[in-house]
């Protein structure tokens, strides 16, 4: 069966037996298979799991106490070493606090991107280097190709599981050290391989939720920072007061359900104003836009975005199939994106990820 899972050498001109690989093991099936496969192929595998928070509920997240035990069991059954590193303090300070800050600013965060950006691909990558390992491997569904001293990043062959959207902030320097061996395979086959290896996580469900949110994100914010949940007005697009809300952290742009207003026509959240603590609602027509601005851009091409604009495809959320657009650079690592064929809900705090076909070019945060 292993003949169906051939991968390119992780390090050029270096045999598997002389290549030390750190695999970031979340306790899920994907990273477990990545570690097991590389071990079977002869690589010197070291499994590392990051203890990010204390959660034993097992409610569809990752990197909690139960997941750590799952990863440890996989490593033990396959016969390679495994270590757990406690990153709870860094995770709380840089991911959870950022998550709350973003909501209180009237934006909708993506904590998984932030975790990849500052915990896995910064701190863990540095730890990997300090161990003398050759590469850091993850179970993400994304493809990376190095050719002519340039790095190309592509969507996964399994488009339903593609995770390139969540890795847009990964820098070229980080990508040089990272490997994604599952990018050319489909999830169904990865589960078959997990069964072939007799891994205890072979039937484990995919993580669906934000890992540290065991109830709802609203209750999580109310518990961790209750002073941020303040009552305020719900207004229409003309500024008329329609009702009262229990905190702007309970709303996201584009939200329709749970607004708490009775109306003949559907109402959507069109704006969140943290300065006045107001939630603006209106018809869907007031929500759709074809122009957006992004900041903190991570650009993977050697050539910068031309001032005349670049024709691209953009994804404004992970499930978005993509829209044709033109991106124009601005000062201070910002850009303007003009959608060409459609109007979309533009949600500040989310990511706008830029593609040329299935090649990811980079992206930025919607502001």
From Swiss-Prot:
Coiled coil: none annotated. The keyword Nucleotide-binding applies. Residues 161-163 are annotated as: Interaction with tRNA. GO terms for molecular function: ATP binding; tRNA binding; tRNA-uridine 2-sulfurtransferase activity. It is found in: Cytoplasm. CDD domains: MnmA_TRMU-like (cd01998). Disulfide bonds join 115-211. Pfam families: tRNA_Me_trans, tRNA_Me_trans_C, tRNA_Me_trans_M. Its EC number is 2.8.1.13. The active site is at 115 (nucleophile), 211 (cysteine persulfide intermediate). Keywords: ATP-binding, Cytoplasm, Disulfide bond, Nucleotide-binding, RNA-binding, Transferase, tRNA processing, tRNA-binding. The keyword tRNA processing applies. It catalyses: S-sulfanyl-L-cysteinyl-[protein] + uridine(34) in tRNA + AH2 + ATP = 2-thiouridine(34) in tRNA + L-cysteinyl-[protein] + A + AMP + diphosphate + H(+). GO terms for cellular component: cytoplasm. ATP binds at residues 24-31, 50, 139. It comes from the Bacteria. Catalyzes the 2-thiolation of uridine at the wobble position (U34) of tRNA, leading to the formation of s(2)U34. Belongs to the MnmA/TRMU family. This is tRNA-specific 2-thiouridylase MnmA. It comes from Ehrlichia canis (strain Jake). The gene is mnmA.
